[in-house]
Design a protein with these regions (language model features):
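Conserved, mostly hydrophobic/aromatic
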Residues: 3, 28, 56, 102, ...
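Active-site environment of divalent metal-dependent phosphoester hydrolases
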Residues: 8-14, 31-34, 62-66, 105-107
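Short, electropositive alpha-helical surface patch
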Residues: 17-23, 27, 76-90, 113-127, ...
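Glycine-rich tight-turn/loop motif centered on a GG-T
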Residues: 30-42, 56, 70-75
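Mid-to-C-terminal alpha-helical segments outside catalytic/metal-binding sites
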Residues: 131-180
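Histidine/acidic residue-rich metal-binding segments in metalloenzymes
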Residues: 1-25, 38-54, 79-95
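Short acidic/histidine-rich active-site segments
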Residues: 60, 92-117, 121-139
Length: 180
């Protein structure tokens, strides 16, 4: 079983870490040290994930990346995402960070949801009704260019091996250790 600790309070989060004999994940989150938000992870939580062998999936929801971006309309960039990744690496280690974009507006996902629920507008209102600009990047309406995260990681000095870990290698390790 793979345990996801996203959206848990401190007591439950640390109880789950203590009870788990396998690595856990936080499927999508940012870090408080870069953007103070109750939803983001404290350094204590990051250290616990690192000690457990788990992985934090870095999200791209702008209100969790840059403080005040929702109110100011400021566009969040890939540099902001990498700031969070840098901090996770600094506190938990390179083996404990990945991508967990928390973004379901990809065309394939939209089409699957539409096929599952034939009622007009029902999917748009829930899955794709996020206001434009509520997610991140230079073009807030299109994250399909997400592969450029690798270019930003290169520019920050990450090695090819470390980039492969961030882009999926770390999560694959945890999946192999938990669900085989």
């Amino acid at each position: 079983m793979l345990i996801d600790l996203t959206h848990l309070n401190d007591a439950t989060f640390f109880d789950c870490i203590e009870a788990s004999s396998k690595p856990v994940i936080v499927s999508h989150d940012g870090v408080q040290a870069v953007c103070p938000s109750e939803c983001n992870l404290s350094d204590d939580r990051l250290r616990a994930i690192g000690k457990n062998g788990g992985v934090v999936g870095m999200e791209i929801v702008k209100t969790e990346l840059v403080r005040g971006s929702q109110e100011t309309g400021e566009l969040v960039t890939f540099d902001n995402v990498i700031d969070h990744i840098d901090h996770i690496v600094e506190v938990a280690g390179i083996d404990h960070v990945g991508l967990g974009l928390d973004y379901d507006n990809f065309p394939l996902v939209r089409n699957v949801h539409r096929a599952m629920c034939p009622f007009p507008g029902s999917i748009e209102g829930f899955y794709t009704g996020i206001p434009k600009g509520d997610h991140m990047t230079e073009d807030p309406n299109d994250i399909s260019e997400g592969y450029v995260i690798a270019e930003y990681l290169v520019n920050r000095g990450y090695s090819d091996n470390d980039i492969l870990k961030i882009l999926g290698g770390n999560l694959m390790r945890v999946l192999e250790e938990t669900i085989g």
